[in-house]
């Protein structure tokens, strides 16, 4: 048992480069590859993420920039969110920030149009 504790202690003191070299040496000695399971898991994760994007029904309206007409943008943010003057001003000046989250595609497009008409730059994600 003392030998295992020493091995653990020795492995813990390795640098990242030394650990990578150790990994390569063990792969060669045992005839295995540590990279194969990781690549398969990454490919599976990417395939699983694709259907989620296709089914997206909720969108976030992000104010990326207030533009030159900040006062009109603040008024529009207040109308959309129901925030007070100070909170709306802080949101506009702190761009990029979410104005509304988890809204339908139609509502997100409507909010984007209103904010852009007020002079803001907006992203829908």
Swiss-Prot record:
Domain of life: Bacteria
InterPro entries (UniProt xref): Ribosomal_bL12, Ribosomal_bL12_C, Ribosomal_bL12_C/ClpS-like, Ribosomal_bL12_oligo, Ribosomal_bL12_oligo_N_sf
Disulphide bridges: none
Pfam family, one: Ribosomal_L12
CDD domains: Ribosomal_L7_L12
GO CC, alphabetical: cytosolic large ribosomal subunit
Keywords, in A-Z order: Ribonucleoprotein, Ribosomal protein
Gene3D superfamilies the record matches: 3.30.1390.10, Single helix bin
Xref: SUPFAM superfamilies: ClpS-like (SSF54736), Ribosomal protein L7/12, oligomerisation (N-terminal) domain (SSF48300)
GO molecular function: mRNA binding; structural constituent of ribosome
One GO term of the biological process aspect: translation
NCBIfam families with a match to the protein in the record: L12
HAMAP family with a match to the protein in the record: Ribosomal_bL12
Family membership noted in the UniProt record: Belongs to the bacterial ribosomal protein bL12 family.
Annotated function: Forms part of the ribosomal stalk which helps the ribosome interact with GTP-bound translation factors. Is thus essential for accurate translation.
Assembly description: Homodimer. Part of the ribosomal stalk of the 50S ribosomal subunit. Forms a multimeric L10(L12)X complex, where L10 forms an elongated spine to which 2 to 4 L12 dimers bind in a sequential fashion. Binds GTP-bound translation factors.
The protein's name in its UniProt record: Large ribosomal subunit protein bL12
Lineage of the species this protein comes from: Bacteria, Pseudomonadati, Pseudomonadota, Alphaproteobacteria, Hyphomicrobiales
């Amino acid at each position: 048992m003392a030998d295992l504790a020493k091995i653990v202690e020795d492995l813990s003191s390795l640098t990242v480069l030394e650990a990578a070299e150790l990994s390569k040496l063990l792969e060669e000695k045992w005839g295995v590859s540590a990279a194969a399971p990781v690549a398969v898991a990454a490919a599976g994760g990417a395939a699983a993420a694709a259907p989620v994007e296709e089914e997206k029904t909720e969108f976030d309206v992000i104010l990326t920039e207030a533009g030159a007409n900040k006062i009109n943008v603040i008024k529009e943010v207040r109308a959309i969110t129901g925030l007070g003057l100070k909170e709306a001003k802080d949101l506009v000046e702190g761009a990029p920030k979410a104005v509304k989250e988890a809204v339908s595609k139609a509502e997100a497009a409507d909010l984007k149009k209103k904010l852009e008409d007020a002079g803001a730059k907006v992203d829908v994600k």
